[in-house]
Amino acid sequence: FEAQLENLFFVTNSVAGRCGPDKVMWDLEELWSSGVRAILSVNDGESVHISRLKAIGFAYEHIPLSSNAPVQSGDFEVCLDALPRIIKFIEQNETQGKVVVHCKSGKDRTGLALAAYLLKSKGFGVEESMSAVKDVRDIAFSAPDWDWFTEKVLVGLSNT
C-alpha cells in the first residue's frame, strides 16, 4: 500500500491531505488497508463515489470550501462557516484511524482545512499551523491570494 501513502502528506500521525481522485485516482481498498478510516472532501466531491466509500466502511463527509483564486467577496464567510464542521469531522474520526482531507490539487483548500485543524485542535498559532502544512506540502497556499487569505481566515477562526 506504499503507493497509496506516497500521495498523502501527514500533518499528524493520523491526519493527512491529498489531491482529489479527479486529479490522481485513488485505490480505496488500499487506503483502507493502510489504516485510512475517514475521507473528507472540501471541494465539490468530483469523482468521489460515495456509495463505494460507504460500502467499504469509510466515514465520509462533503464540506466545501471556497475555490476562488483570486479570492472573491463572500469567500471569507464561506470558509469561516465551514471550518468548524471540518475540524469536528477530523476530531470525531482521527481516533478510529487515519483521516484524509482532499480538494482537487490538495494544496489550498486542503491546506486551509489542515491548518485550521492544527490551530483549533492542536493549539498551533496561525503562522505555525501554516508552516506545518507547508513543511509537508510545499505548494500549499500557492494559488493567487491564498497566502494572505488563509492567514486572514485562520486569524478569524482563532477569534471564535
Please annotate each region the language model reported:
Residues 1-100, 105, 112-160:
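Cys-dependent protein tyrosine phosphatase-like superfamily
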